[in-house]
Amino acid sequence: MRLHPVHPSLGSLRRFDSLGPIAAMVDRRSHRSVHEFSLRLFDAGLASAELMACYLGLELGLYRVLREVGPTTAAQVARHADLNPRMTREWLEQQTVAGIVTVDGEGDKPQDRRFALPDEHAEALLDEDSEHWIAPLVVMPIGGIAAVLPQLVDAYRTGEGLPYAAYGEAMRGGQAGLNGGVYKHHLPGWISRYMPDIDARLRVPGAAIADIACGSGLSTLALARMFPDAQVHGVDLDDASIADARDNLATAGSDLAGRVRFTAGNASDEPLTASYLLVCLFDALHDMAAPVEVLRACRRMLAPGGVVLLMEPSVGERFTATPPDSERFHYAVSVLHCLPVGMSETPSAATGTVMRPETVRGYAREAGFDTWVIDVGHPFHRLYRLTPSPESPVPRVVSTLPDRK
């Protein structure tokens, strides 16, 4: 057997020389597959590192300075942001090679280069009112999930999950921001288009809406703006979320103050039973340890002719190894957050983010609802309209509602 000199990375091919061309071809394919997978992980690692650098830009106010000051030098950016000049220049150069920031005078001396943030990038990073605002997706994994990774390791070993509060303020604010654009830009149209009967009834003075697991209240405030004659009540067991919601209400305008209120606690403690025309759970049911009991509590709160509206992740009817990227995202979020949160209470349904339509139908059926699936054409969200089944009695016992995410 004659061995030819080869590149070290192909050294494993040598042992197949005596086995013929087919074996060598198979090994080459295996090597190529490993190489391609390694490159894929490198790309993921690079994206993670660049996301961390974006987190620095948001937390340190660097993007804000770039937008306000315009094309300028690293020294000027550092001065306006009150940061170390050398570290600021390194960040600006990194942002340039990442394609986030532009540079004028690439070949000039470092101190003479002028950096700028393109308007479209500024909108995605800084404009909270834009439906393209993506900054929360930077904050959530870096500021929220990364901090609890050691606890997640333990949670996977014990199966005890991880409470929502453990993820902290960054995760709480990131979640609110990520869905805030949906509530503002899409939810009004969805309700009027797909639920015109409920939309009309909610415009009659005296109508009442309950927003269960309301989080920081952005969905509650959006509902109040949608229906200016309705009373809207947001409820959440997480005290920090309700504090955020009340802060948001305080800055939302005096026209909402008399119609919106927030309660920290169990929705079943609400004294006005059977009074709500619409009970909402937005992006929350899949996180709850006892989803059927939650839906039973919501059913008890409905006025005659009232409905429950769910917004949940838009995922496929069944598992597939090659789903769209949106479902890949939902699985990653489930692994890192939603499933551990849902399993932090026992007993738990352990649903996870990827709650498929048949699972929703099953939970709703057990709670005494008929289900209408509403495909709104959004890559990340789907609506479900639940109406009480005529043959199912209203439950007399209402279980405690778990926290929102």
Q: Model-flagged regions — what are they?
A:
Residues 2-43:
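Long, low-complexity, charged/polar intrinsically disordered regions in eukaryotic proteins
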Residues 27-32, 38-60, 64-65, 80, ...:
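Conserved Class I S-adenosyl-L-methionine-dependent methyltransferase catalytic core
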Residues 66-70, 224:
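Short helix-to-turn junction characteristic of helix-turn-helix DNA-binding domains
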Residues 71-79:
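Short acidic, hydrophobic short linear motifs in intrinsically disordered regions
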Residues 135, 142, 146-286, 291-293:
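Conserved adenosyl
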